[in-house]
């Protein structure tokens, strides 16, 4: 059976995208839906490949009972074929993802969107990068990510339910 695949992307894959990945996995676990999804995160840059998420983000997430376990990697051309959804954290990430897809002439079917577009209260155009700020910035970003990830899930939940009912996916 096929699974719905989601890739979260930020600049270095050590703050926003691994947090979004962990939040989405946590949401799926609470709903007992992890078997129907493949979830990952990546960065547009290569500076942090193989490293854990920023300790400030991990600590802020742990206070919410969210464990960030992934290691940083860089997005690549195969991702356009392997993921149904690629969700960028900001406009720069979005452009870099589009540029990579165009440069590699990928024929992949991935739907590339900005995660912020799924936020229930869209008063910001992007998920801000907390890397150079203080600890409070990480909590603020987690608030935005939780809201946006929930909105994304709600937007695709009907696809999941229809796919299960048609036997394309299993529970």
Map each language-model feature to its residues.
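Conserved active-site segments centered on acidic
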Residues: 1-83, 157-163, 168-171
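Helix N-cap/beta->alpha junction signal
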Residues: 17, 90-91
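Phosphate-binding/catalytic loops
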Residues: 85, 91-171
């Amino acid at each position: 059976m096929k699974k719905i695949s989601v890739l979260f992307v930020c600049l270095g894959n050590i703050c926003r995208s691994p947090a979004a990945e962990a939040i989405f996995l946590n949401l799926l676990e609470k709903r007992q839906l992890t078997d129907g999804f493949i979830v990952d995160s990546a960065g547009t840059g290569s500076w942090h490949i193989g490293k854990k998420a920023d300790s400030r983000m991990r600590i802020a997430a742990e206070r919410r009972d969210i464990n960030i376990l992934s290691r940083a990697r860089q997005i690549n051309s195969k991702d356009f074929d392997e993921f149904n959804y690629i969700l960028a954290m900001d406009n720069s990430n979005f452009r870099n993802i589009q540029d990579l897809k165009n440069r590699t002439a990928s024929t992949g079917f991935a739907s590339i969107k900005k995660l912020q577009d799924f936020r229930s209260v869209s008063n910001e155009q992007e998920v801000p990068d907390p890397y150079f700020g203080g600890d409070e910035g990480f909590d603020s970003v987690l608030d935005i990510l939780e809201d946006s990830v929930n909105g994304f899930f709600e937007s695709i939940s009907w696809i999941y339910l229809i796919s299960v009912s048609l036997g394309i996916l299993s529970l």
